[in-house]
């Protein structure tokens, strides 16, 4: 951009990009993208396909996060959400809305390059996120988009074959193991319940009565961390059972990972029953997710049905 008439350089573009990124829910966006990339790499996809999976997923997650802040702009302003650039008036709602649609379009285009099964799975995943933003978050069914989206994430990562650009291996589409899909689904429950805990009062004041709100602080918190434990044991079972179980050090690492997740869940439940619905709970879920990501990476080809 050129200088203004008074000689001041226009620095709005970098600032706008930073504010858009801050409006995209970067923590969950990065976590989901890393999870998809790790699964894609673990099942043996070539580097370029892992990168394509990551690009498609990050575009979809950016669109979901941006749509959330655009649609919730008035509500966030009403409750004084200082962590939301739109609520603080630092960026226009229209700018965030446009970015949400653009990134959604990019996600659809990139998804189409992954191959038919992965493409359909990812478009449904992104649509589930938008459905949550658009109104499901206010209903008892608010947990459904999370179950669908996280359950489909392994399908996107494992089934991607690049056949849409003539790069498929010709061996047919791979499908994730049932336990990988189940792990994603129950992990989605944990993410949803924990993410809304710090906002229960603000949400109640603005008419949001989703699944976690109806459970209350203790009910939602306990459900979240119980789901994490279930996810950990699903991953453990997927590694030590079946036709090709891990052995030796692999068993040790699998068990240690499960123990770590259970310990983090215990800390989380203790905080919940102490009435501390802080962002610390969400950080515990993110930490648990990183442990599960490592375990999924170690599972390798066992992720494929």
Task: Give names to the regions the model predicted.
Residues 1-305:
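Multi-pass alpha-helical membrane architecture of UbiA-family
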């Amino acid at each position: 951009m050129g200088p203004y008439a008074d000689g001041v350089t226009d620095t709005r573009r970098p600032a706008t990009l930073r504010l858009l990124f801050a409006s995209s829910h970067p923590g969950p966006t990065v976590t989901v993208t890393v999870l998809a990339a790790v699964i894609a790499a673990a099942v043996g996809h070539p580097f370029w396909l892992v990168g394509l999976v990551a690009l498609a997923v990050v575009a979809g997650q950016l669109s979901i996060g941006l749509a959330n802040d655009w649609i919730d702009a008035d509500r966030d302003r009403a409750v004084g959400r200082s962590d939301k650039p739109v609520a603080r008036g630092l960026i226009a709602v229209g700018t965030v809305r446009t970015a949400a649609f653009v990134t959604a379009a990019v996600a659809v285009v990139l998804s189409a390059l992954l191959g038919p099964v992965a493409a359909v799975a990812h478009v449904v995943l992104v649509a589930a996120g938008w459905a949550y933003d658009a109104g499901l978050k206010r209903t008892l069914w608010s947990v459904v988009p999370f179950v669908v989206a996280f359950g489909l994430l392994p399908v996107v990562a494992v089934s991607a074959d690049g056949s849409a650009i003539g790069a498929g291996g010709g061996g047919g589409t791979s499908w994730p193991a049932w336990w990988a899909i189940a792990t994603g689904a129950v992990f989605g429950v944990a993410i949803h319940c924990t993410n809304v805990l710090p906002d229960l009062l603000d949400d109640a004041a603005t008419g949001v009565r989703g699944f976690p709100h109806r459970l209350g602080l203790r009910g939602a918190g306990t459900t979240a961390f119980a789901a994490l434990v279930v996810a950990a044991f699903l991953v453990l079972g997927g590694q030590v059972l079946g036709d090709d179980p891990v052995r030796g050090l692999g068993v040790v690492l699998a068990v240690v990972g499960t123990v770590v997740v259970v310990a983090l869940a215990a800390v989380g439940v203790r905080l919940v029953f102490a009435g501390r619905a802080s962002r610390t709970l969400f950080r515990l879920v993110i930490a648990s997710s990183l442990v599960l990501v490592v375990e999924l990476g170690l599972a390798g080809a066992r992720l494929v049905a």
